[in-house]
């Protein structure tokens, strides 16, 4: 089966493409002309090294040309600098690595943070112009935490207007490994792109899941989802074209359709073609699968479900999810909910 091409984050790099299944190799869609790319694919491991813009400064501990990681490094731009170092612990034959990031402003330490434990020292440190409301660049810290299909933990250090006070903003945990922020739409400001991890495992297994691109920005010191902004339509449209190409082969499968169709409908919503996407989903979805038809809306502090909801059908469950996730409005009513 040919891979479904959409947005996917690989273990050690950013592939501005997703795949069907998610573990297969990905290709990259085109960018505005100012951004160049070089992709290397080796089995299921993929690395996409995006050419750095002149105003982007990045340090990565992982070196594809060396057997040893770089355990110490520094990035610097104007008055802002950041350094990373690792300490190692060994217990019962297992290694654990702990990164520490130190941020300086005008040579004065303004923030120090120890990152999450990891089975291997893979991290990325970047000074990036992400916030047009801030005269100073931010420091992006992404680290690989380990785990099944997991995790790229992303944090950003950002300052107030005069650089005297710095705080940390959490972008979250994402599938795959560290990668840099990039100026996706050539407006002079970097964004951070991922797949929307809420789709993974939701209506299919991980291998059967697909997800639309999710694009994050820093605005006035706050993390904001800008996926719906018009300047990123080219990304969603290229994903939609790839999905249309592979739709016939995927829906011909006996199972694992619904994870793909969830992303298909969401991507259609992103480009203003929700009704068409919804009718396609109704025609092809797996009526025998009960994956995702039960959902917990509230948990207690012991992770016990306090409010469970059961849906009668996949379209009902998908609609509820897409409303909650912000892809469609609550007033959306499909002309037909079954075909």
UniProtKB/Swiss-Prot annotation:
Which keywords belong to this entry? Signal, Thylakoid
Main location as per UniProt: other
Q: Which GO terms describe its cellular component?
A: plasma membrane-derived thylakoid lumen
Give the range the annotation lists for the signal sequence. Answer: 1-26
Localization annotation? Cellular thylakoid lumen
Organism's domain of life?
A: Bacteria
Q: Does the entry feature the keyword Thylakoid, yes or no?
A: yes
- Record's keyword annotation contains Signal: yes
Protein name in UniProt: Probable thylakoid lumen protein sll0997
Organism, by scientific name, is: Synechocystis sp. (strain ATCC 27184 / PCC 6803 / Kazusa)
């Amino acid at each position: 089966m040919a891979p479904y091409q959409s947005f996917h984050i690989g273990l050690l790099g950013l592939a501005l493409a997703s795949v069907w299944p998610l573990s297969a190799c990905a290709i990259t869609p085109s960018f505005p002309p100012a951004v160049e790319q070089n992709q290397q694919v080796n089995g299921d491991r993929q690395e996409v090294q995006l050419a750095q813009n002149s105003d982007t400064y990045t340090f990565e501990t992982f070196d594809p040309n060396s057997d040893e990681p770089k355990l110490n490094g520094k990035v610097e731009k104007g008055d802002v600098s950041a350094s990373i170092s690792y300490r190692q612990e060994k217990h019962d034959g297992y290694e654990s690595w702990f990164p520490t990031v130190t941020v300086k402003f005008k040579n004065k330490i303004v923030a120090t943070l120890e990152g999450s434990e990891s089975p291997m020292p893979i991290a990325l440190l970047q000074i990036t112009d992400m916030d047009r409301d801030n005269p100073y660049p931010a420091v992006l810290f992404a680290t690989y935490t380990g785990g099944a299909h997991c995790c790229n933990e992303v944090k950003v250090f950002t300052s107030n207007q005069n650089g005297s006070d710095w705080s940390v903003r959490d972008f979250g945990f994402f599938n795959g490994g560290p990668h840099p922020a990039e100026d996706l739409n050539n407006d002079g400001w970097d964004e951070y792109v991922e797949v929307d991890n809420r789709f993974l495992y939701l209506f299919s297994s991980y291998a059967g899941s697909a997800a639309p691109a999710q694009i994050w920005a820093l605005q006035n010191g706050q993390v904001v989802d800008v996926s719906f902004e018009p300047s990123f339509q080219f990304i969603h449209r290229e994903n939609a074209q790839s999905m249309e190409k592979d739709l016939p082969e995927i829906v011909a499968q006996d199972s694992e359709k619904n994870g793909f169709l969830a992303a298909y409908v969401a991507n259609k919503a992103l480009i203003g073609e929700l009704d068409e996407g919804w009718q396609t989903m109704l025609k092809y979805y797996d009526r025998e699968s009960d994956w995702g038809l039960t959902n917990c809306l509230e948990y207690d502090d012991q992770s016990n479900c306090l409010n469970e909801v059961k849906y009668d059908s996949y379209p009902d469950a998908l609609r509820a999810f897409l409303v909650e996730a912000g892809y469609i409005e609550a007033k959306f009513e499909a002309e037909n909910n079954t075909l």
